[in-house]
Amino acid sequence: MAVPLMQQIRVGAYLIKQRLMGVERYPLVLMLEPLFRCNLACPGCGKIDYSDVILNKRLSVHDCLEAVDHCGAPVVSIPGGEPLIHKEIVEIVEGIVARKKFVYLCTNALLLEKNLHKFKPSVYLTLSV
């Protein structure tokens, strides 16, 4: 998958800024997991071994955006579980996009047709299957 030129430039500028400021260690990608639950039970995935107490937990929109702001990384990857199960995933993605962060929404695509229309097209949003 090719990385769009705008993303290359923005991430490159972020890297240069960190170097110029003398920052030695800085985040590049935030792995944001708003939930562990999935609509599949793949044997190779360790998430299915978690108890229902863990699988039923959800991060709120506020908690997700607070993590994005605190981390400061230019790229946010949202893996799963299956993020499209989260009832507020659209609001989470919109909040991240509004912050001009590049979002990679990783999905198994089983719920994509049902939910795709809810997401506004953006140069900051990439769906990864």
Where are these regions (language model features)?
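Conserved alpha-helical substructure of the radical SAM core
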Residues: 2-115, 124
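Non-cysteine beta-strand/loop elements that form the S-adenosyl-L-methionine
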Residues: 122-129
